[in-house]
Structure formats: C-alpha cells, structure tokens
Amino acid sequence: MIIIGEKINGSIPSVAEAIANRDAEFIKQRALAQANSGASYIDCCASVPEAEEVETLKWMIDCIQEVTDLPISVDSPSADVLTEAYKFCRKPGIFNSVSGEGDKIDKIFPLMAQPENKGWQVIALLSDDTGIPKSAEDRLKVFDKIMAKAKEYGISPDRIHIDPLVEMLCTSEDGIAMNVEVISSVRKQYPMIHITAAISNISFNLPVRKLINFGFVVLAMNAGLDSAIMDPTNRDMLGLVYATEALLGLD
C-alpha cells in the first residue's frame, strides 16, 4: 500500500495556525512523525488564498525537506500553482491533483511528459466540469477521458493514482457500493494503475468513525485500492492495512 501522509494540510486548524505564524518546528515535527511511521509520501497542502499559495508551499516544502527525504505530494486545487510549486521539490513526487475539470490535465500532463520529470506521478480525481458524477457509469466515463489524455501525452498508467472520490457515508444512497464498483472496474482495465482515496472522508459527521474507516479500507483494498491518503501515525489503521495486505496475498 502506498501511504500518502495527510497531516500537513492547512485545512487542519493547528496546521493553519502554524502556517500563519511560520512555525517551522510544528511542520517539521509532523513531517518527521509521518516519515517515521511508514509514510511513502508526505502530502503538503497550504489551503491559503491562491495569491499566497506558491510562496507558502515553498516554505512548507522547505520545512519538510529539512527533516526527511521522502517524496512530497504537492497538493493544490490550482494547476497553475502546481506547475510552480513542484519545482521546490528535491526529488520527484506527486501532483495532487488533476481531474476532468477545465484544462488542468493539459497543464500537468505535458510537464510529466518532459524527460526531467519522468519520475513524477499524479492523483487524478473522477470529476469534471459538471461536478462529481452521481453514478459509477458516469465516473468511469471521466476515467476514460483521463486515460485518453494520458495516452496522448505518453503518461503510463503506473504513474497515475485514480481517486474515485469517496463521499460521506451519511449522504450516500448505496453505502460504498458505487465506489467499490468504480475501483474494481479501474483495476480490471489497468492492472498497473494506482487507485487512491482519502480514507477519512467516508465517516465524516458519523459516530464511531474509526470503525467505519476500518470497514471501508478492507472493502476498498479487496476491490483494488493500493494507495491511501491517511494518517500513518494511526497505528491501528496502519496495522489494519498491513493485515489486509497479508490476507489478500499482497504483502
């Protein structure tokens, strides 16, 4: 399982405060804790106004790289920000993210196609200009368009992490059945592709979130999930991931 550490994100109040105060030690401690807990990548999201985002991401990336040499998932909703911020990374990481929305793919995929950026990967969300499709069929249509673009630019499937966009269980009509269908279909079509998800989204606004997250991880991994945006310092969750890999013969 590819673990993308989620704990350096400006949408978290304590991280937002550290960013505002330029508290480098706080960012470094979070990066080091995730690195020591088994993260594969450290996600770095500023969640500040776009005019401040590139400079803020530079500061955050510099802090992270002072304490770990793990690759970074550079996280921004703006493709323009990503095309600048990735330059601050010392080694190839992940562009987080593109989607079927607007021209994001046409800004990021050409960068990834450049010889000097061959090691970079990307998270691709199954949404488009209409928003998040409601059915598995429509999400898979977005997926097909993304993969057509990947072929056009010469981006191999093993450099792509497809995010089927897990939504809150409390607003879902069919639990996670649709997500499982999407994950299974993507995995069957492209055995070498990566499939990721923000694990904690599923349990938002629900009691006993931990148990719901656990159940989702097992079902999603069985369907083909091999990447996760999660808290690697959560030993119970990480242990569950390793146990599920063993049970599926993936360890």
What are these regions (language model features)?
Residues 3-29, 96-103, 129-137, 202-210:
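Active-site mouth loops of central-metabolism enzymes
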Residues 6, 52-90, 176-197:
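Alpha-helix-loop-beta-strand connector modules within alpha/beta enzyme cores
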Residues 34, 75, 85, 162, ...:
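Conserved, mostly hydrophobic/aromatic
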Residues 35-70, 164-176:
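Glycine-rich, proline-tolerant flexible connector loops at the mouths of alpha/beta enzymes
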Residues 38-39, 69, 90, 120, ...:
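A structural motif
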Residues 43-50, 70-78, 93-104, 126, ...:
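Catalytic beta/alpha-barrel core
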Residues 106, 116-251:
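Catalytic alpha/beta core domains of metabolic enzymes, predominantly
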